[in-house]
Structures are given as structure tokens and as C-alpha cells.
């Protein structure tokens, strides 16, 4: 059974929203001339707005022609800079069109960090290069660790970047070769040799890897090859463009039962695909919430739209090196915390075991089971099942064992049976 926030909290929330709306209206009146100007101007053609002037301390330039030619345009409210203080994550919706195609399609633009995080990045670069918090980034970048691979360095190696981000917490050479070979911010992609990249491209690659590796996840495990991630389109300065998938998973929380069953089955299939695949890369989702998934409006397909916190472990290397307890199945510990979207895990263990149940645990605990809480609700995506399913009890038992197993290795078996049962339910309701 799912529950809403208590009435007092609900009223307080509504009061705060009304107060914020009132303040916003006052600000809009006071700034009406600049408001009109920002509405009429396409700021996505402005080099400084794109922060193209900060390259190579940026994420790439492959889409600059499209931005600067006016092919990318903010949607309605995205044009109002006055609203940026509400957009903490720096995520925008826009329309993109190719002149030859006619018509436009929706895209998502990301700065890959908040204003504060981006300012801290600049300060960090400057302090490392000059000892001062402000500097010319163009001059500073070649004096940082992001330039260490410039020149005649042949490969991107684990020793150079290990631990820089979740993606490379425990990188194998095979993974890093894949990142370089599929790097989309160069005209000469397709080779794993660093010498085929320009110095500026190498610095952009390393900066992206350290600051927010999401673009590299999308490029290395592309949707075109069946991976469940949004499609990467390109970057200009510090603005990255990805394909718009659809409404976030949260908007389906109260969808009809048959729809929620199908979405739940897809989520478990994603957990399986990222854990066990022919490439022998395990992609572990370290941040799992309703906001990090979206659903296609036409095909109803579930896609991961926030891939910043993905740890990739090379199972082939684990089996080859055989670290201590490498072949002992690892069971993630249930985390009954009082916050939303909690997960308990050890990155070191994820990197050192060949058989891990983390993705099943993350999906069951944070999305599907009665333990899932989000935006004041509880009960998970599969709340309030039909009476015959609730009476049978099998679904609830499988969800509980998947989230908080009572038997040793119980989650592995529960996840397998849950996938099969959801597939059966999904077929029955279609």
C-alpha cells in the first residue's frame, strides 16, 4: 500500500511552492525588459553561454556547428535565465533540427554539474596550475594532470586514471581501450591509440572522465548496440546533448497495473543485462532512483538517463587475476535507512568478485519493493497489486527476498524467479 506525505507536510510544501511562485512573479515584473530579451535571443548560439571559451577545460566540440548555426533552440521556459536558480542540475530541454530533414526533435542538454560544481572545477584547475583560484583556463590546462598524456603517450592506462570516477574505479586496459576507441569528440575515432587524438581532445577526454563520465558511458555502451542508455549526440564547450527518451519513470508510479508490471519486468531485465553480458563487463548502478530512468512514449522502453554513477568491472580480468575470494558470490547488504534511494555497497568488492547481485538489489530495494520510497510515497512501483495477485502472495514474497533476502544467496534465486514471474504477468495482461 503506498502512502502520501502527511497532510501537514503536504500543506507546508504547497505553501512554499506558492511563496516561491509569488516571488518569481515579482522578479519577472522587475526584470521584464531583460526577460523579453532573453526570450527572444537564442543563447545557444553564444560561445560564452556554451562556455566554449573554457576549452580544452570542456567536454568537447563535436556539436558546435549545430549550436552556433542556431539548429538547437531552448524550449519555452528554458529560454528564461531568471529560472536558472531553480534548475540546480543544469538540465535543459531543447529542439534540434537538421536543415535537410525538416522538422525538429526534442533533445536534452546537460552541463554535467551544478554551477557550484563547475566553479569548483575551474578553481581546482587554476590552483593546480598556478596556485591561484582564478586564471586563464586555456593556459592552465596544459599544466595539469589532464595534460599528462599529451605528446607521444601511446595508451590510456589504468595507472593514469584509476579512481578518478566511478567509471574507472578499477579500470582494465580493455575498458580504457574501449573508451578511447569510441570517444565521440574526435574526427578520428575508431582507434584505441591516444596518439590519434589531438592534445586538446586528450585533455577533454580526461577532464570528462574525472568530472562526470556520463558521456563516456553513453559512448562506450551505446543504445544503438542494445545498451539501455540514452543516445549520446555531441557536445559544445560545457554543454552536452543527448537524445530525449520520454517522461521519467516517476510519472508512471500510478499508471495502470499492466503498465507497471511491464516496466518492472524491463527494469529487472536491465539489471540482468548490466550484470551478465557477452562482453564480460559488469556495469553496476550506484545511484538508482525513479528520476534516473525514463520511458519511451511510443515503444514504452525503459532507458537509463543518468549514468554518472556507473562502476564498470571487467569480469574477464577478475577471472584472470583471481583476487582473494573472487569466485565467492557476493550478496549486497540490505540498507534500511531513513532516506530516499539508499544503497549499501563496497566498490572494492564490486571490483573483485565475478558474481555479484548488486543490480538486482538496487532495482528491487529502490524501485520495485515495499521498501522503495520516493517523493513522500512508499510501496514501490508495484504497489497495490490486483486482489488475486495480492492474495496469492508470490509477488510480495519474491520482492521481499530480492530486496532483503532471508536465505543465503536468496537474492540471486529470487531475482531469477521474479524476472520470470513478471514476464508471465506481463504476457497475461497484454
From Swiss-Prot:
Record's signal peptide:
1-35
- What GO biological process terms are annotated to this protein in UniProt? cardiac muscle cell proliferation; negative regulation of smooth muscle cell apoptotic process; positive regulation of protein kinase C activity; regulation of phosphatidylinositol 3-kinase/protein kinase B signal transduction
Which locations, inside or outside the cell, does it occupy? Cytoplasmic vesicle, COPI-coated vesicle; Golgi apparatus; Secreted
UniProt keyword annotations, A-Z? Autism, Autism spectrum disorder, Cytoplasmic vesicle, Golgi apparatus, Secreted, Signal
Xref: InterPro entries: DIPK2A/B (IPR020519), FAM69_kinase_dom (IPR022049)
Q: Does the keyword Ribonucleoprotein apply?
A: no
Q: Cellular component terms, GO, for this chain's entry?
A: COPI vesicle coat; extracellular space; Golgi membrane
- Tell me where on the tree of life, at the top rank, the source sits: Eukaryota
Q: Which family does it belong to?
A: Belongs to the DIPK family.
> Tied to what disorder?
Genetic variations in C3orf58 may be associated with susceptibility to autism.
Quote the function comment for this protein.
Answer: May play a role in cardiomyocyte proliferation through paracrine signaling and activation of the PPI3K-AKT-CDK7 signaling cascade.
Q: What is this protein called?
A: Divergent protein kinase domain 2A
Please state the gene responsible for encoding this protein: DIPK2A
Amino acid at each position: 500500500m503506498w502512502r502520501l506525505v502527511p497532510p501537514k507536510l503536504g500543506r507546508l510544501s504547497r505553501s512554499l511552492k506558492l511563496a516561491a511562485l509569488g516571488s518569481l512573479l515579482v522578479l519577472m515584473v522587475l526584470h521584464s525588459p531583460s526577460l523579453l530579451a532573453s526570450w527572444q535571443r537564442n543563447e545557444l548560439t553564444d560561445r560564452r553561454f556554451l562556455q566554449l571559451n573554457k576549452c580544452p577545460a570542456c567536454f568537447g566540440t563535436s556539436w558546435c556547428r549545430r549550436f552556433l548555426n542556431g539548429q538547437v533552440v531552448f524550449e519555452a521556459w528554458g529560454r528564461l535565465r531568471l529560472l536558472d536558480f531553480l534548475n540546480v542540475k543544469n538540465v535543459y530541454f531543447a529542439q534540434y533540427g537538421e536543415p535537410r530533414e525538416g522538422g525538429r526533435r526534442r533533445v536534452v542538454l546537460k552541463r554535467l554539474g551544478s554551477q557550484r560544481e563547475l566553479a569548483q572545477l575551474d578553481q581546482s584547475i587554476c590552483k593546480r596550475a598556478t596556485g591561484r583560484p582564478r586564471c586563464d583556463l586555456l593556459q592552465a590546462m596544459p599544466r595539469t594532470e589532464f595534460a599528462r598524456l599529451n605528446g607521444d603517450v601511446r595508451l590510456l592506462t589504468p595507472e593514469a586514471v584509476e579512481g578518478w570516477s566511478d567509471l574507472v574505479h578499477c579500470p582494465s586496459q580493455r575498458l580504457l581501450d574501449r573508451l578511447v576507441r569510441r570517444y565521440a569528440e574526435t574526427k578520428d575515432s575508431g582507434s584505441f591509440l591516444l596518439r590519434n587524438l589531438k592534445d586538446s581532445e586528450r585533455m577533454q577526454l580526461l577532464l570528462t572522465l574525472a568530472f562526470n563520465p556520463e558521456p563516456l558511458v553513453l559512448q562506450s555502451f551505446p543504445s544503438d548496440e542494445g545498451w539501455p542508455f540514452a543516445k549520446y549526440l555531441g557536445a559544445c564547450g560545457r554543454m552536452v546533448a543527448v537524445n530525449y527518451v520520454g517522461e521519467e519513470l516517476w510519472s508512471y508510479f500510478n499508471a495502470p497495473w499492466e503498465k507497471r508490471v511491464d516496466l518492472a519486468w524491463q527494469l529487472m531485465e536491465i539489471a540482468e543485462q548490466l550484470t551478465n553480458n557477452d562482453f564480460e563487463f559488469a556495469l553496476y548502478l550506484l545511484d538508482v532512483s525513479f528520476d534516473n530512468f525514463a520511458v519511451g512514449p511510443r515503444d514504452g522502453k525503459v532507458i537509463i538517463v543518468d549514468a554518472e554513477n556507473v562502476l564498470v568491472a571487467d569480469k574477464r580480468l577478475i577471472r584472470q587475476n583471481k583476487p582473494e575470494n573472487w569466485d565467492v558470490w557476493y550478496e549486497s547488504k540490505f540498507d534500511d535507512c531513513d532516506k530516499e534511494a539508499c544503497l549499501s555497497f563496497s566498490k572494492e568488492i564490486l571490483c573483485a568478485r565475478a558474481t555479484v547481485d548488486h543490480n538486482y538489489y538496487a532495482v528491487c530495494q529502490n524501485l520495485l519493493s515495499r521498501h522503495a520510497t520516493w517523493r513522500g510515497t512508499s510501496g514501490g512501483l508495484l504497489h497495490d497489486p490486483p486482489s488475486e495477485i495480492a492474495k496469492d502472495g508470490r509477488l510480495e514474497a519474491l520482492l521481499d527476498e530480492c530486496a532483503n533476502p532471508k536465505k543465503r544467496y536468496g537474492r540471486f534465486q529470487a531475482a531469477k524467479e521474479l524476472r520470470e514471474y513478471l514476464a508471465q504477468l506481463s504476457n497475461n495482461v497484454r
